[in-house]
A protein has these predicted regions:
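Conformational switch/transducer regions in large eukaryotic molecular machines and scaffolds
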Residues: 1-503
Length: 503
């Protein structure tokens, strides 16, 4: 609506939107609505009370009178906090605080709730709101890809009357051309749905995730590799990919195959370590048989043993974007499994993980419990973690207890990463860990730069490592406040100051 208002300022249907996002389970009830100090009996407003008052003020404190104001609750709905909202949601439209203050909602205000489910919401609450159910498969993964392409495709060139082509300055560190975007779009359309449907029907998944999450994981790996090629290596190892589009000279024309090859191999590597990485060992064996066979001949979907996969594809109304059999110019070598190689963009080759094992001896003064014996698994995990962390993505390492996850992540944080840039903040969750304790542990390790802004020393990046993520006690209605706090940090880039109530 804000974008439409900027484009059509005279159209009264579109108004600018101001909004506040609150995860109600990342703070306590007192911090949400407000509370009396037990010693001084002084009233302190909560996060919701402050935002509600600012939006409901007449004359408006924020924006103009016709601007829309949304209070957006992004978190679990339960009987602990939602019952206090009933007076807001009924005909009174008033927020009643324990201090005795009542604030009426303005005509331009709206309350929006975005929970995962309404399993523990009371009928009194549900009857007061309009419910819109977003089915997991309704949106699909295509908008994720479209959004990624829109974020990185180069700005269109302009042509003057004399035929001179000029391209506007682009502040982004790297972009892709329209031709490269077309290759990405076609390969995703050809590979993603068959791979996801195969995993859903034929593989026992250890981690159940939505299709969109799998595609976003693929995009993040692909983006990290592209950025590594185009920015960190100054384009030298990019196999023909360039940050800015150049005139199509003969030399540039000869590089198209290399550019296509780099995109193909990067997408294959990303699919293997996202969609193909959710299964158990037996499932990986099946995916290892499927992917090369599909790349060789996509008609294997029509075989009798693939009936379940084909049925699922038909339910998705999937059609291959390729009019004829597509041939990948540099497929994953068949000497090992698809999980046995990583892609090296600098020389456009596949390199066995065995060749990337660190064979150096441990330090003589290292404690026995801290020594990690390098193998293929540590090489794979090390490369993937380095790739994601250094490109500002959040990895989640899961597995059974006692498999060495914590020890290896400590090794990555303290040995693989540049200690002059990356500053680890390590937190171990317990059953009694609260959201406020988690917030305090992180804030204490950061410098306060100005009001509402915390961060590590200038020129450095803070890496927060949460050990035993699953440990916090589950509340009566199913929420885990420390995890909700982390989700708010990842989704919105911050949290509310416990004292000032600022975001």
């Amino acid at each position: 609506l804000s974008t439409l208002h900027e484009q059509y300022p005279e159209d009264k249907k579109f108004n600018k939107v101001y909004y506040t996002i609150i995860n109600p389970k990342s703070v306590t009830m007192g911090q949400l609505y407000g509370q009396f100090d037990p010693v001084s009996h002084e009233w302190t407003d909560g996060v919701l009370a402050i935002s509600y008052r600012n939006y409901a003020a007449e004359p408006p404190k924020i924006g103009n009178a016709e601007d829309l104001k949304w209070v957006w609750f992004d978190g679990p709905v339960d009987a602990i906090w939602i019952e206090n909202m009933n007076t807001v949601l009924d005909d009174n439209k008033k927020l009643c605080l324990m201090s005795g203050e009542m604030m009426a909602m303005s005509n331009t205000m709206s309350m929006i709730f975005e929970p995962m489910d309404l399993e523990v919401a009371s009928p009194a609450t549900v009857s007061r709101v309009g419910v819109v159910y977003m089915e997991p498969f309704r949106m699909g993964w295509q908008p994720c890809l479209d959004s990624w392409i829109d974020a990185f495709i180069e700005l269109p060139a302009s042509v003057d009357d004399e035929g001179n082509v000029t391209r506007p300055e682009d502040p982004r560190p790297w972009t892709i051309t329209a031709d490269q975007a077309d290759i990405v779009r076609k390969l995703y359309g050809w590979l993603i749905d068959p791979c996801i449907c195969f995993v859903r029907k034929m593989v026992s998944e250890q981690v159940g995730v939505h299709d969109q999450t799998l595609v976003v994981a693929t995009l993040r790996l692909m983006e990290s590799i592209f950025e590594e090629i185009l920015v960190n290596s100054d384009g030298a190892g990019g196999a023909g990919m360039s940050v800015k589009a150049k005139d199509m000279s003969e030399e540039a024309a000869n590089m198209i195959t290399l550019r296509r090859e780099t995109i193909e191999c990067t997408i294959l590597f990303s699919i293997v370590w996202s969609i193909g990485a959710t299964g158990d060992e037996e499932g990986r064996k099946k995916f290892n048989e499927f992917l090369p066979a599909y790349l060789e001949d996509s008609s294997i979907i029509d075989k009798p043993e693939m009936k379940g996969v084909k049925t699922l594809l038909m339910l998705r109304s999937w059609e291959s974007p390729m009019k004829k059999q597509y041939k990948v110019s540099n497929p994953i070598p068949s000497e090992n499994t698809v999980y046995g190689y990583s892609y090296i963009p600098s020389n456009s080759t596949w390199k066995s993980w065995d060749e990337q094992i660190d064979r150096s001896l441990p330090s003589m003064d290292a404690s026995f419990s801290s020594i990690v014996v390098p193998n293929v698994i540590t090489a794979q995990l090390g490369v993937l973690l380095d790739l994601l962390i250094t490109h500002n993505f959040t990895p989640l390492v899961c597995g059974p207890t006692g498999t060495g996850k914590s020890v290896f992540i400590h090794t990555v944080l303290n040995e693989h990463l540049d200690q002059n840039i990356y500053k680890p903040i390590q937190i171990a969750f317990t059953a009694k860990t609260s959201a406020n304790q988690t917030q305090d542990q992180v804030d204490q390790k950061l410098d306060k730069r100005r009001r509402g802004i915390y961060g590590p020393a200038f020129g450095c990046k803070a890496i927060v490592f949460i050990d035993d993520l699953n440990m916090p006690e589950v509340e009566e209605y199913g929420a885990q406040p420390p995890i909700e706090l982390l989700r708010q940090m990842i989704d919105n880039g911050g949290w509310y100051d416990i004292q000032e109530k600022d975001f």
